[in-house]
Amino acid sequence: MKTHRRLNRASSILSQVRIATASTLFILAATMAVLGAGKGGGGSTSTGPARPNANADAFTKGPTVDTSSVLVQLKGDPLSTYVRTKPAPGKKIDFNSDTVKSYRAQLSALRNDFKQWLQTNAPKAKVTGQYDISLNAVAVQLNGTPKSTIEQAPQVVLVQYQGIYYPTDNNDPDLALISAIAAWNQGGGAATAGAGVKVAVIDTGIDITHPCFDDTGYPAQTQLGDQNFTNNKVIAAKVFNNKAGKLGVTPEAIQDHGTHVAGTLGCNLDTPATVDGVDIPYDMSGVAPRVLLGNYNVFPGEVESARSEDILNALEAAYTDGFDIDNMSLGGGSSGAQDLLTKAVDDLDQAGFISAVAAGNSGPGSFTVESPGAAARALTAGASTVPHFVGAPLTVGASTFGVASGDFATVTSDLTAPLAVVLDGSNLSQACSAVSGVSGGIALISRGTCTFSTKIRNAQAAGAVAVIVVNNVAGDPTAMGQDGTPNQPTIPAYMVSLANKAALVGANGQSATIGAALAYFSTTNADIMAGFSSQGPTDVDFRVKPDVVAPGVNVLSSIPASFCDTPPCFAFFQGTSMATPHLAGSAAVVKGQHPTWSAAQVRSAIVNTADQGVLRDFQTGLSTVTNVNIIGSGRENLLSAVNAKVALDPVSVSFGSVPSGSSQTKTFNVTLTNLTGAAATFSLSIANTTGTGVTYSVTPSVSLGAGASGTATVTMTAAKGSSRGFHQATLNISGRGGSAHAAVFTFIK
């Protein structure tokens, strides 16, 4: 099955925090840059309180499949999709209705029949979980029983090894990028942003002692689960791990990932923040500051991964507990078109439960989106940059540059020495072999193909007193990690951004000072795609993913009290894990302002109104990224989302694959729903077609009454011999003073 990574912290190189769920294990991957090359790694990474994260370089994945356990899908539709029990759009399943009770009993009987069969035919196997909301299924510990034996049982539809998943890591710059404050103001202001909406954070737990989650001023709530870890802001605290009893774990936030995610999603309005002794010059807020949160801990204690059944248990419990949205900043390997965890996400969406999910941190590269982010009806997040970090000042002449620390030594008092530029011909040297001309100086070298440890060690051997490494990709400097080899270098070392390269190379020989006192730096590096952000299309069926991009690099948020000397604690993390709660919080704001909208309509409002033409390439920071399998529909704009006039289902148009040698015409129906209070005619058109040999057309207009739905048909024609590769276009919709757009995609094989 799949393996999901948590997109979390990087407090030491290659440190990982994994999250496990029922049939897949989910991981929170904490990654710090270790290599010189600016290639993205997976998972969410935290630089620690003072370390910024720009592009993760490397991380180690754990196993993607647990072959000792399986999910078994049985015949019979689950409650979320069965025609007599599935809720109407905008509603939830009524568990108290006689129809639902009766059908649940029928499904239970089917599962009991399976358990009886198991006792007779596979007595060593043990049922460890049962499901009826998202799937009619059971989780089974095989205990040596062959998977093929389970497949012979009556009523079995599919037997799938459990996947392993891992965590994937107001002038508030996050909120400014997505126009959150303007969206709040339209709906009554910050005091009502997300009020009454419940979001389940399926992660490592939430530290309720943090001021981000202080419940002062919140009305009394029914608190669920372990009330040692709940209040009237975080209203549920439960553990989901099949070894929880043996491990003696609780919902307590021992790891930092979940608290960081929860802060981005719903931190109380205007919470003062300090990072490593540096006062942040704005008071942070979550995207939905009045939202109610649930701690559904699938990575309890020091547990590093979760299986599919853990995640399924958490999803069904959150739905049953009355939550509206879940946030899954985790990921794992995909099981393709038959992935049961993605099916569960899709089914729950149809039952009114919105799932915001990380795309993964396995980019750059196509086909790297992970499960359950690959689910068709998941709100899947890619990651882009936030333009700020905390670092040390490097002063050369009249100019000061921000530099980032990492695992290497830092100065304890101001250090002044000549800047010694190391050249390899006319280029800045990567210092992957012996260097010269730096004795007594601060060596300026380039990020490149060898590890940071190697290049810094070479500079130290040549007599350098400190090292400044120039990044080779766009964005703010990243935290540098050691490579784990013996005899690590001992001199101070920092990274500076690529944008500062020319100025520093031109200052060769000038006196330079590295300051010991850290500072907050605001930069111009916004809206750069993260190199690590996983890319589509999905495997097997070749659909557009991610759906939309949100801030996910250098995201400031809360972490538990045990992670700093003087709580409350805050840190900058990076990863699609950090982008995901921006989407979950946005969904809460949209749902709060439009409570009758269905899960699909809320998703569409966010995806199909995103800003286009704003995201830049991570390698240069100059060219605009248009590839829909990198950016989806663009970077989210919450103000546009709450003002959406039309909803699309699905949110993108994917024609799958077409052989290059054939001539084919395919059609794709999109359901349009008029979200306004009056009749409207919506005009449709196709623009921005790429490649040769593939053309698109669409129904020119659709007229809909207030709240009504209708169908628009997109037609794709691929000429014989069409150029191989990815072909895309944009479907534009306008009407009633609003507009929307959707990605259109075909893969010519």
What feature does the model see in each segment?
Residues T45-T168:
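Inhibitory N-terminal propeptides of secreted protease zymogens
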Residues T45-T64, Q119, T128-Q130, Q141-E151, ...:
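N-terminal domain-start motif of subtilase-like serine proteases
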Residues S46, T60-T67, Y82-R84, W184-R307, ...:
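Subtilisin-like serine protease catalytic core
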Residues A195, L312, S662-N669, G710-A712, ...:
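Short, solvent-exposed loop/turn segments enriched in Ser/Thr/Gly
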Residues I202, P211-D214, Y218-A220, N231, ...:
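Structured lumen-facing ectodomains of secretory-pathway proteins
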Residues A262-G266, D270, T274, V298, ...:
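Hydrolase catalytic cores
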Residues I528-S534, L638-L675, V698-S701, A718-G721:
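Beta-sheet-dominated interaction scaffolds and their linkers
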Residues K720-K749:
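Terminal connector regions
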